[in-house]
């Protein structure tokens, strides 16, 4: 029987779930995850306790609860459940209040922007920009890009671009490097004016072949020798052009995005 883990929040639960994944990944154990977002009333808090207690009875062991409930009364209700309750706000906010000699707002949902805030609008603009400039489909307004990711097809450019846009409000375009570029020995002409914005992604040729075979099995496009050729040529071009790059083979999208932000000095987010 897998241990049951509840993610309880008065908002979307994204913060609590991210934290929970980071903690639980330290254990060689699978868990059954139950998300309980928008617990923004006492009635919902009591209903959540019922769910937690039912899981404890079913599992024959108490549940584990990660909570980011801001309302102290709701939090106290959840803490009376048959569970190990890990209260992230109490653990971190109270010591910060003492250190800063300030009281926190204790307002629900402050960690996520509302639709009418400038931060939210910036993020939506960045997402629209990244979608419009995915895989080199448009050169229009490329000068507005914060970063332009380059690399061979299926090296991780699209998911990284969208993650940068959604998570950080970064206008990230991406552009493929194709065999014709390698034959010319030059970057695509559309990228020439923006060399300072370029960041490259590479990948292990064998892994690239596996990914491409899922899309076009048995094709030259997916053949190991072709993948080796494209990767070797792409990396040589990036070195020649002075483009910073990394291998996406063993890195998560989060790690790739964080490295890019550091390398191109886009670590500008404030709170």
Swiss-Prot record:
ADP binds at residues 151-158. It catalyses: [pyruvate, water dikinase] + ADP = [pyruvate, water dikinase]-phosphate + AMP + H(+); [pyruvate, water dikinase]-phosphate + phosphate + H(+) = [pyruvate, water dikinase] + diphosphate. GO terms for molecular function: ADP binding; ATP binding; phosphotransferase activity, phosphate group as acceptor; protein serine/threonine kinase activity. InterPro entries: Kinase-pyrophosphorylase, PSRP. Keywords: Kinase, Nucleotide-binding, Serine/threonine-protein kinase, Transferase. The keyword Kinase applies. The keyword Kinase applies. Its EC number is 2.7.11.33, 2.7.4.28. Pfam families: Kinase-PPPase (PF03618). Bifunctional serine/threonine kinase and phosphorylase involved in the regulation of the phosphoenolpyruvate synthase (PEPS) by catalyzing its phosphorylation/dephosphorylation. PANTHER family: PYRUVATE, PHOSPHATE DIKINASE REGULATORY PROTEIN 1, CHLOROPLASTIC (PTHR31756:SF3). Belongs to the pyruvate, phosphate/water dikinase regulatory protein family. PSRP subfamily. HAMAP family: PSRP (MF_01062). This is Putative phosphoenolpyruvate synthase regulatory protein.
């Amino acid at each position: 029987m897998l241990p049951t883990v509840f993610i309880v929040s008065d908002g979307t639960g994204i913060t609590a779930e991210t934290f929970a994944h980071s903690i639980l990944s330290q254990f060689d154990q699978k868990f059954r995850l139950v998300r309980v977002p928008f617990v923004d009333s006492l009635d919902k808090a009591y209903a959540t306790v019922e769910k937690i207690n039912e899981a404890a009875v079913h599992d024959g062991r108490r549940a584990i609860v990660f909570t980011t409930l801001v309302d102290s009364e709701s939090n106290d209700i959840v803490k009376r459940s048959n569970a190990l309750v890990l209260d992230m706000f109490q653990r971190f906010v109270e010591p910060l209040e003492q250190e800063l000699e300030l009281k926190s707002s204790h307002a629900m949902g402050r960690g996520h922007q509302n639709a009418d805030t400038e931060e939210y609008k910036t993020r939506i603009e960045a997402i629209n920009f990244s979608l419009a400039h995915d895989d080199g489909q448009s050169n229009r307004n490329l000068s507005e890009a914060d970063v332009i990711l380059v690399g061979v097809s299926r090296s991780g450019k699209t998911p990284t671009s969208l993650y940068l846009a959604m998570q950080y409000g970064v206008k990230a375009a991406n552009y493929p490097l194709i065999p014709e570029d390698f034959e010319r020995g030059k970057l695509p002409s559309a990228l020439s004016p923006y060399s300072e914005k370029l960041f490259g992604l590479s990948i292990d040729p064998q892994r690239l072949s596996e990914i491409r075979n899922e899309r076009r099995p048995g094709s030259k496009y997916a053949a190991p020798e072709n993948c080796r050729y494209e990767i070797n040529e792409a990396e040589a071009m990036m070195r020649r052009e002075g483009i910073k790059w990394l291998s996406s083979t063993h890195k998560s999208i989060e790690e790739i995005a964080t490295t890019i932000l550091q390398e191109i000095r886009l670590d500008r987010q404030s709170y």
